[in-house]
Amino acid sequence: MKFLLAAALLATLAVYSHDFSVQDTQSRVLLRLEDDWALALIRRDAAVFRRLLADGFIYTEDDRTVSRDDVLHDVVAGLDTVTTAHNEAMRVHRFGATAVVTGWLVVGGHGPNGSFDRRYRFTDTWVSRDARWQIVAAHDYLVPATHR
């Protein structure tokens, strides 16, 4: 009886440890994709954004809501030129085939009004479809310069 109990316990632990390692791997993938986003801002890399943004993607920032096409246009042909971008303090929250990533996006560059340094608090919602992660919704809050 003790042998069966021990075997059942080991089998259960093996299943859970496998689930955790899969989750850890998927979390690392999502963090890398978030970093790909930041790098694509600097490069104005439309191909990366087309790969990352799901059809039907929706983005909100402050008082506006925009579509996938609007985001693609803004990051590739917008008036601002991003020269630095990186993420900080990212956390992945998994819900099966859906994940929410929160963190800080720090962006620097120049635009029509001169140089800028921006800090965004972001919440990105990712869905795994056909063995790849795509972002379906994103919200950014631009921290006012007086609060940085």
Stretches with model-predicted labels:
Residues 4-12:
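Sec-dependent N-terminal signal peptides
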Residues 4, 16-148:
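A beta-strand edge to alpha-helix "cap/lid" segment located at domain peripheries
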